[in-house]
């Protein structure tokens, strides 16, 4: 049995930002986005995840520009975004700011006119009529055949290209569970010989943590949506969070988010789906044990559904209304070891006199402590008492800068959907 993989050191306190390059600027280019790097760095972003930068198939394309996830060539860039050299310059600029770059990788399928369909038709699965097909109902892509060893070899070489040529820092692997686990074991083993990378899987399968550092929290996202629609209470949220802590390896990272490209385009913005709870739940996603994901435009906040297959730029207004909100949360994650992912940190819910409406919890590592208190209700909570003597002492409210002392006699007031985050002095 091979030795277990270990996360790169910088990943434990990193903050991830998903870049929808097409919609980010009017130009939708690598060069235009590069000008945004200092602002994102100042907001606390550490890692940039770029949706696929590869060319998009024309055959059976959806919309005018097509899906990022219908690749026509694994080792070149989408010329709408810019040249390979311009992408390299973007990576270099990010690295100069001590930021990391990971790219989206679509290993399960390609677009219908990928070069392999002509050069290596044996790389693809066939239906009963002998035709290329996709087994998931996606009309613009066709499935690769991982029973063919040549597919595995070619895919690994393509992934090596981006590490060696562009010096990227990791991969976000699209629908990773559709690709055999033993392939991912091999690819990480080989790529680790070139550079230690960060591996994020778009899946929630426990077994994939044999390879991947982090996986998605789709179950929690859907539970948050159900919570807002009044079909579940706080206990429903806590149940899913508990499962992440008990059913997964202690070393597993979980990616928490209130929105991403799929949710925004197909289901609506976080404000459509989570309503007044959106901000408090964003605090939860940034402070629970795991890694936070911020999607393009959340700092505005962007409240419109961005088109997925057509040009539909984010409507930046220069105000970045939630910049400071995220900056305070993300810099706390960067600086306070209590909010680290992985092992070695303690997390537990703090009982209160209003547990049906208040979700309070403690994060601790050594002497570092962070207390998070969320009013997850439509009602004001005027006299909240925290019934846990293990953390009593002096803390600073990260949003207001005011100091407070928690003791058996102290209490606090929270308006509907209000949140508070305290760092121990």
Set out the residue ranges of the language-model regions:
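Active-site-proximal helices and loops of the catalytic beta/alpha 8
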Residues: 164, 174-254, 284, 303-332, ...
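Soluble or luminal CAZymes and related metallo-dependent hydrolases
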Residues: 29-32, 82-86, 150-155, 179, ...
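Short catalytic/ligand-binding loop motif for oxyanion handling, primarily in non-cytosolic enzymes
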Residues: 56-61, 109-114, 179-182, 207-210, ...
């Amino acid at each position: 049995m091979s030795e277990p993989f270990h996360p790169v050191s910088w990943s434990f306190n990193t903050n991830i930002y998903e870049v929808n390059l097409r919609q980010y600027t009017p130009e939708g280019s690598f060069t235009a986005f590069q000008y945004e790097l200092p602002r994102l760095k100042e907001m606390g972003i550490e890692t940039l995840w770029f949706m696929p930068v590869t060319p998009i198939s024309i055959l059976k394309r959806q919309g005018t520009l097509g899906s990022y996830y219908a690749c026509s060539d694994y080792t070149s860039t989408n010329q709408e975004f810019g040249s390979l050299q311009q992408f390299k310059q973007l990576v270099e600029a990010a690295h100069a700011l001590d930021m990391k770059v990971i790219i989206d990788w679509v290993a399960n399928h390609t677009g219908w006119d990928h070069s392999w369909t002509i050069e290596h038709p044996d790389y693809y699965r066939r239906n009963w009529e002998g035709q290329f097909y996709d087994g998931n109902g996606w009309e613009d892509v066709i499935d690769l055949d991982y029973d063919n060893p040549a597919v595995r070899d070619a895919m690994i070489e393509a992934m090596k290209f981006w590490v060696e040529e562009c010096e990227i820092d990791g991969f976000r692997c699209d629908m990773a569970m559709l690709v055999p686990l033993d392939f991912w074991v091999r690819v990480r083993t080989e790529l680790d010989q070139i550079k230690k990378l960060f591996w994020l899987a778009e899946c929630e399968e426990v077994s994939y943590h044999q390879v991947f550092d982090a996986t998605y929290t789709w179950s929690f996202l859907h539970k948050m949506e159900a919570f807002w629609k009044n079909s579940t209470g706080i206990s429903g949220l806590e149940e899913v969070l508990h499962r992440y802590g008990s059913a997964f390896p202690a070393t597993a990272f979980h990616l928490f988010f209130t929105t991403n490209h799929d949710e925004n385009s197909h289901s609506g913005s976080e404000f459509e789906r989570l309503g007044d709870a959106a901000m408090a739940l964003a605090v939860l996603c940034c402070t629970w044990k795991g890694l936070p994901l911020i999607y393009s435009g959340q700092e505005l906040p962007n409240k419109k559904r961005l088109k997925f297959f057509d040009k539909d730029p984010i409507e930046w207004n220069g105000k970045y209304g939630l910049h400071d909100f995220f900056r305070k949360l993300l810099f706390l994650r960067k600086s306070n070891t209590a909010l680290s992912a992985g092992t070695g940190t303690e997390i537990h819910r703090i009982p209160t006199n209003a547990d049906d409406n208040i979700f309070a919890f403690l994060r601790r590592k050594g002497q570092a402590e962070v207390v998070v208190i969320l009013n997850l209700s439509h009602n004001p909570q005027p006299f909240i008492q925290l019934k846990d003597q293990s953390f009593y002492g002096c803390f600073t409210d990260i949003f207001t800068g005011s100091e407070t002392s928690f003791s058996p006699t102290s209490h606090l007031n929270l308006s509907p959907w209000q949140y508070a985050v305290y760092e121990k002095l």
